[in-house]
Regions:
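Conserved SGNH/GDSL esterase-like catalytic core that processes O-acyl groups on lipids
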Residues: 2-97, 127
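A generic secondary-structure signal
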Residues: 11-12, 63-70, 101, 105, ...
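Hydrophobic beta-strand segments of well-ordered beta-sheets in folded domains
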Residues: 21, 74-76, 114-117, 147
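Residue-level recognition of beta-strand->loop/alpha-helix junctions
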Residues: 51, 119, 149-151
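Short, contiguous clusters of charged residues that form electrostatic/catalytic patches at enzyme active sites
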Residues: 58-62, 97-104, 134, 181, ...
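Active-site segments of SGNH/GDSL-like serine hydrolases
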Residues: 79-85, 107-131
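Charged, glycine-enriched surface loops/patches
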Residues: 93-118, 135-145
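Catalytic His-Asp segment of secreted/periplasmic serine-dependent ester chemistry enzymes
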Residues: 123-197
């Protein structure tokens, strides 16, 4: 399955532009409606979803090189770990080492790349997921990445934001603001919207 996904993303990369925003995730991340959210919210950066149905942190560096490195992203949202819960229970330190190695690898490719580590959703109050999220927060903090905590129950309402954006444009601000949006705001839009819930 992953080989087909990699092949698809390599083909899409022929159309992609560099310096965009990339979601590097797994599971339900493959269904995030990037085009619609980007258009509705006036995000001026190109956005690409390079998520896989299943992806372990163990394979992440190789997959990054095949599918993401060629488009030289300005921002990467890493949302990996769901497939690693069993391995994490057995050995926390290997998970931490491989996650840090991925972040280091991304920075070696582009020193200015903004990186956000996204927590794993856990609706069933699984203590292993809770512990993994604590590790992800520590990794993000120690590696100077932003941390997107999806365990905080805040649902982003894209319709209200779209109405606000429309009002601002109608008041004479025709073009979206060109300054980079705070990563946490984008995390809320992409991973916590009613559309994706």
């Amino acid at each position: 399955m992953r080989d087909l996904e990699i092949k698809k993303y390599k083909k899409l990369n022929e159309l992609a532009q560099s310096d965009g925003i990339v979601i590097f995730g797994e599971g339900t991340d493959t269904n995030i409606p990037l085009c619609e959210l980007r258009q509705a919210l006036g995000v001026d950066k190109k956005m690409y979803n390079r998520s896989f149905s299943e992806l372990s942190i163990h394979d992440a560096v190789n997959v990054f090189d095949a599918c993401i490195s060629p488009i030289a992203p300005e921002t990467v949202f890493i949302h990996i770990g769901e497939s690693d819960i069993t391995a994490f229970k057995g050995n926390h330190s290997n998970f931490d080492i491989e996650y840090r190695a991925l972040i280091k690898h991304i920075r070696e490719q582009n020193k200015k790349c903004r990186i956000a580590v996204i927590s794993i959703k856990h609706t069933d109050n699984n203590p292993d997921v809770e512990e993994m999220n604590q590790h992800l927060k520590y990794i993000a903090d120690s590696e100077k990445c932003e941390f997107g905590d999806l365990t905080v129950q805040k649902v982003w309402n894209p319709k209200a934001t779209m109405q606000t954006s429309s009002f601002i444009r109608n008041m004479g601000f025709v073009h979206p603001i060109k300054t980079p949006k705070p990563l946490y705001d984008l995390i809320r839009v992409l991973f916590c919207s009613e559309v994706c819930a």
